[in-house]
């Protein structure tokens, strides 16, 4: 049975990752995590600039890291992470208690 991944489901899993796991927020730290090989999953918001999006997709494909295109703006991605600022990209380093890596 395939579980349907909804936006609310992703947001609750992101909140659990932020509480129990490790994640980096922001473009520079996401690129650094991809280059180091510590990133397991990368989230990119809808309104991320095209140049940055293509660069992250390029490095993630070289490192064979999964990418999830978040359905929402950078404000919504930051809010889903429990932060009060905008976040266009994020990388999950350790999922913690969340099963977000299994649903991708």
Curated annotation (Swiss-Prot):
Q: Which UniProt keywords apply?
A: Ribonucleoprotein, Ribosomal protein
InterPro entries named among the record's database cross-references = Ribosomal_eL30-like, Ribosomal_eL30-like_sf, Ribosomal_eL30_CS, Ribosomal_eL8/eL30/eS12/Gad45
Q: Which SUPFAM superfamilies match?
A: L30e-like
A single Pfam family it belongs to is Ribosomal_L7Ae
One example GO MF annotation? RNA binding
Q: Which GO terms describe its cellular component?
A: ribonucleoprotein complex; ribosome
What superkingdom does the record give?
Answer: Eukaryota
The parts of the chain that form a coiled coil are none
Cysteine pairs bridged by disulfides in the record: none
Q: Where are the transmembrane segments?
A: none
Q: Which NCBIfam families match?
A: PRK01018.1
Q: Which family does it belong to?
A: Belongs to the eukaryotic ribosomal protein eL30 family.
Its name, as the record gives it, is Large ribosomal subunit protein eL30
- Organism in which the protein naturally occurs: Tetrahymena thermophila (strain SB210)
According to the entry, what is the taxonomic lineage of the organism? Eukaryota, Sar, Alveolata, Ciliophora, Intramacronucleata
């Amino acid at each position: 049975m395939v579980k349907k991944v909804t936006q609310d489901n992703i947001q609750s899993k992101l909140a659990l990752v932020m509480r129990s796991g490790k994640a980096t927020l922001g473009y520079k730290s996401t690129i650094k995590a991809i280059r180091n090989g510590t990133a397991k999953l990368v989230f990119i918001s809808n309104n991320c600039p095209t140049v940055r999006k293509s660069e992250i997709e390029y490095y993630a494909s070289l490192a064979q890291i999964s990418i999830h295109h978040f359905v929402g703006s950078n404000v919504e991605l930051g809010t889903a992470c429990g932060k009060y600022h905008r976040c266009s990209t994020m990388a999950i380093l350790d999922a913690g208690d969340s099963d977000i890596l299994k649903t991708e």
